């Protein structure tokens, strides 16, 4: 049986960067902690230090992602305004991803803090299910509950037509704000 060696600060952060860069999927703090043989809290601190050094790491509902600016970019991006209650969140996300569109984030305008943005990066029904499961299991509130259901999403897709189709689906469902 092999015993995992606990990595020290700088070497652990180097490994974290390597693991994140090599991964095609988000990695959770728990997964990274297990690989590095440290607590999840140590990983959270390490990620904060890496972000402070301008490493393009984002935290999503599925885990940490390294955003490689040299990687493939989506050809089309659009910010859309939506309005609905919490009970329609899953429907909204599924309408979008069913058109081959990724929901990059959610943005609300807070009266004190200004724009608050949370990364979502949800692009498939499976990712929608994972997001919903996480919201429900943690009893977390949606950001849009702070603004009576009004919120923005940044949508990305391989082409503008997919985003137009998603917008039409949202409008037909009475979710898209058009005025």
Per-range role (PLM):
Residues 7, 20, 37, 83-84, ...:
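Residue-level marker of alpha-helix boundaries and capping positions
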Residues 30, 60-61, 106, 145:
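Residue-level detector of family-conserved "landmark" positions at structurally sensitive sites
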Residues 57-68:
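Minor-groove-contacting beta-hairpin "wing" of winged helix-turn-helix DNA-binding domains
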Residues 26-59:
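N-terminal helix-turn-helix
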Residues 1-34:
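Extreme N-terminal segment that seeds HTH/winged-HTH DNA-binding domains in transcriptional regulators
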Residues 74-179:
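Mid-protein regulatory/catalytic core that forms ligand/cofactor-binding pockets
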Residues 14, 18, 45-48, 94, ...:
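Solvent-exposed alpha-helical segments within well-ordered globular domains of core cellular machineries
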